[in-house]
Amino acid sequence: MGRLTRYELRSRFVAVHQDVYVAKGTLPNAVLRAKASWLRSRRRGVLAGFSASALHGARWIDADKPAYIIDSNRRPARGIVTWADAIDDDEICLIGGMRVTTPMRTAVDLACKFPEDTAVAAIDALARAARLKAADIALAAERHVGRKGIRRAQATIALVDPGSESPRETWLRLLVVRDGYPAPQTQYPIFNEYGALIGDADMAWPELKVALEYEGRHHTDPDQFRKDIARIDEMTDMGWILIRVTSRDGEASVLGRLRKAWALRA
């Protein structure tokens, strides 16, 4: 492939960082920002944090977030956050030729670097994408004893559950746990009397037959709407109490409805 002239470069591409370009009209996302920051590091850095998480396939990462990279550069370009943390060779993997923190190390970094709610939601998404177990993440954190923020990180990791399928499901789970309820089982399968699967409840306390579901989007498809109604009716006939939560529901409302459900089963 031939070299581009300066005119071709300026007319067809836009600079992301110095000497790093993308085609005009390209929509930024976490993966693109990660690749650009790695090139900006002259291919020497190790992508970390949300950048590593995106490369490992995690969802729900804001396209406007900066890129995160472990690099010795103390004057990063705009849109790049550099960390100077020590890292062992076995905590680095290659993705598309780029050096990236492993999923386990990424989870520990997220727990150390970000506020609890942000970190739990991010690690839930990463763990789900990379098929990590919360117990294994906790074990990985033990090798970092003495690191700044590790005690807080361990408390954060204790709240992780890969069963949460979205940040709002994480929010809902944390809300009820912090209010004193035992951690619910996530993505709990519910079967009818014939052994056929009715559906998976986002969160459930099966011994009480109480379930919580977060409705992230309204079903406009009539067929899907009818299926949802039939599923809810079947669960109700089997003795389940299903609490459906939407973005319009405040914390007090959710907890009030849950208390009533528990009182009925006490």
Regions found by a protein language model. Give the residues of each.
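Short gly/ser-rich loop at a beta-strand->alpha-helix junction or flexible surface loop bordering the NTP-binding
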Residues: M1-R151, P167, A266
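Surface segments flanking catalytic/ligand-binding clefts of nucleic-acid enzymes
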Residues: M1-T5, R43, A84, A127-A266
